[in-house]
Amino acid sequence: GFLNHKEEIHVDSVKESKVYDLQFPLASISAPVLIDNIFYAFDKATLLPESKNALDSLILMLNENPNITIELSAHTDYRGAEAYNKTLSQKRAESVVKYLINHGIAPDRLTPVGYGEEKPKTIRRKVAERYPWLKENDVLTEEFILKLKPEQQETANALNRRTEFKVLRTTYNMFDKDGNLKNPPKKPVEN
């Protein structure tokens, strides 16, 4: 399945018929989705103001998909103690969840998880295209990163420091306590 997505197209007054080809990005619900541009204070869980647009986009997506629940995960690079990184990433995931709750998202739709350094990023096609020294399906483990040039190491570590979400359920609030569909489809009116 895919997440709901909405786009608008505005055209100036057109005097004749015209065909528009539109491509809509479809985010799969089976793979984690990276949330770009979420920034934290150094070595803290405090969200920086420049994260607002990305967080507000996440709120919009959750409002457009009212029946999903998500795991919100934060990740660190390998530097620092493993236990410390796990705690820091948990606090960061919780700070994102707190922001979402403060902006009207139901708490029971959100599960914060801090993975620390235990789930290094796997490189996908778009990232590999941006960084020619990475190949699709490379995994940014400590061992892999230490073989890179210093400037590449910093980029790889930055890619590991990320916030993602994945869909856990697609049936949130769809059924009553007896298992009946809350809003069944309306039957067509016969003439």
Residue ranges and their predicted role:
Residues 1-69, 108, 168-191:
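Periplasmic peptidoglycan-binding/tethering modules of Gram-negative envelope proteins
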